[in-house]
Every structure is written in C-alpha cells, then in structure tokens.
Amino acid sequence: MSLVPYFFELSGEHPSLPLADAYGCCAAECDGFRLSASGPGYAVLGFEPGKLGGIASRLALTRRLGRYLGSSSLDGSSSLAADLELPSGTVAVRVRRFQGCNDGIDLNRLAAKIGGIVARDRKVDLTSPDVELGLFVSDRVHFYLREAEIDRSQFEARKVAERPFFSPISLHPKFARAVVNMTFAPRGGTLLDPFCGTGGILIEAASIGVKVCGSDISPTMVDGCIRNMEHFQLPYERMEVADIGDIGSVFGRVDAVATDPPYGRATSTMKEPLGELYDRAMGSISEVLDR
C-alpha cells in the first residue's frame, strides 16, 4: 500500500480537536494511514490518494488540504520552490499565516518571490488556476497543492436556530461532526447516541452516511430529535425512549457511540446524581460497543 502525504490546514479553533478530527476522518475512511507530522495549525497524514474525497467530505475542523510538497525555512523556500514538480497548467500561489506565527515574514513578498519561481514556464491565473500552490506559514513555511476546501457554511445551515425543535444547550454542528469523526465511525456503520436530545450529533453522523440510532429518557426529546432528522431529510435506524441502563437490550451491538451527556444544570438527570448517571452510562456504553 502506497501512502501519499497530505497537508491539512487546520482551523485552529481548539488546541487539540482539529488534529483529532482529521485523524478520526482518516481512521474511518482508510484501511491504512499514518500521521507523519503536526504543528501549529497543521498536520501531515499519509493515505491512498483515492481516499481524499471521502476524507474531505467529513472534515469539520480543517479549512483546506492537499498533496504535501515539503517544508523549509524562509531562506530555503526559494530552493524548495525551484525543485517542485507541479502539475501542468496555470498556477496561483496562495499564502496564509497561522495565528501570528513567524510574523516577521512578509506574506506578499513571499507570494511574489515563490510565484516568480513557479511561473517561469507557465501562466499565472489568480482567478481560476489549474494549480493552486498553498504556502502555510507556521513553525516553518509549508508547501502543498490545494486540492480540497471544506465548505464550512454547511454547519451554519444546520445550527440550532435552523432546526424546528431545539434546546439552547446544544453543540455547534462543526463540533458535533468532530465528535462523530473521533469515534472512527465508518460510512455504513451504526452509531448510537444514548442521550440524543435534539439530535445534533445524529444529524452530523447521518449527513456523512453513518447509520444512526438514538435514545433519550425524555419522550419530548425523542420526538423532537425525529422532527429534526426529518426536517433535514436524513435517515435514521431507530429512535427510542430508553434509560441509559437499557440501551444494551434495546439496541444490541453498535460500531460507535457518540454523545453529549447531561451536565446536571439545564438538562435533566431525572434527579439522579450526576456521578451515578455517568457511571451507569460508561458501563452500558462499553456493553454495546463492538470494539
């Protein structure tokens, strides 16, 4: 199996979740993959090129990704650029800095310098280029081919205010998607949310082709979750009113579990002490997992 390195331009919205999200997507989509490097705002993961589309379609906390070409210091960037073997066609150089890293580097000058090198034998097209060369300024200058950009507006379209049934206590869809990805749930596999609430996690799982089951001790929440799934025209396997202790007998074995459990404030624990509820939940979840 030949693994090709890909550069992930992470969102930087959390210190560790973006990397975990990218790693989870690769684990779910690939028979084999490898994390070879990571740093401020980026990760390099190797996988088969045919898996790129599937990985990109489920990412939540990555902005862009594509074939990794190499990294250098500012002084070494010209040499690296001169040695690149880019695909044929018009080219554009896109430069981005991660959160103030290497702030002494002038991004416009860097773009002009590298653009002048890679465009010596081809035309520049800044509007609709055949090849987009990404330069990501972080701990070093990282070069990659921009091959996929994540449509993050999709998460805004599914946020709480856009649902017919909602609770003010709910994960933002992009973080709900990241939680799903971190379970390594494969497309076609079954994911259970035993505290489904309004269905935010199940919505994100179903939207990437994972089969979903949900339960909640509140009939109102289960009905509302079904309304939300139907609103977004997403399929579900089963939705049940069930106590966390009964999920094994209700659902049997599943491939993954993802949930946002009650916090004991605005959400209901049916007067059960939070610690006891969590202890029961961990026991029940371990019983239903297939791995």
Residue spans for each PLM region:
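A short glycine/small-residue-enriched secondary-structure motif
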Residues: 58, 87-88
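Short, charge-rich binding segments
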Residues: 82-86, 124-126, 136
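Active-site nucleophile-His-acid catalytic modules used for acyl/amide transfer and hydrolysis
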Residues: 96
